[in-house]
Amino acid sequence: MIVRTTDEITGTHRDVAAANWRSKRIVLADDAVGFSFHETTIDADSVSEFHYRHHVEAVWIVEGTGTLTNHETGEEHPLRPGTMYLLNGHERHRVTCDTTMRMLCVFNPPVTGQEIHDETGAYPPAVQAS
């Protein structure tokens, strides 16, 4: 059994930040459970481009509002607490935040925790945790 709090993660290698977001990586590849689980916060009035070519991601919005844009279809979806979106087709997408958004994210395959988005908005293919 694994039990963790976000307080334990703050300031460790599991607490990853970029220009407009912060992700607390609660469950990672080295936990050996087949997925990773993150609490991610994206800043208000920001736009983020993502394209998880090597991962499937499920996202549950718990706080804030914004818009999800599917670049492949042009469809836009409002984001608010209680909304889930699943990127099961590796869709290139944009998240536009009207307010600070907090979300819970599940990745398969799991991430190691230190991945950085490349120029296309993707994480690299899954690698072994060190």
UniProtKB/Swiss-Prot annotation:
GO terms for molecular function: ectoine synthase activity. Pathway: Amine and polyamine biosynthesis; ectoine biosynthesis; L-ectoine from L-aspartate 4-semialdehyde: step 3/3. It comes from the Bacteria. It catalyses: (2S)-4-acetamido-2-aminobutanoate = L-ectoine + H2O. Its EC number is 4.2.1.108. InterPro entries: Ectoine_synth, RmlC-like_jellyroll, RmlC_Cupin_sf. GO terms for biological process: ectoine biosynthetic process. Keywords: Lyase. NCBIfam families: PRK13290.1. Belongs to the ectoine synthase family. Catalyzes the circularization of gamma-N-acetyl-alpha,gamma-diaminobutyric acid (ADABA) to ectoine (1,4,5,6-tetrahydro-2-methyl-4-pyrimidine carboxylic acid), which is an excellent osmoprotectant. This is L-ectoine synthase. It comes from Mycolicibacterium gilvum (strain PYR-GCK) (Mycobacterium gilvum (strain PYR-GCK)). The gene is ectC.
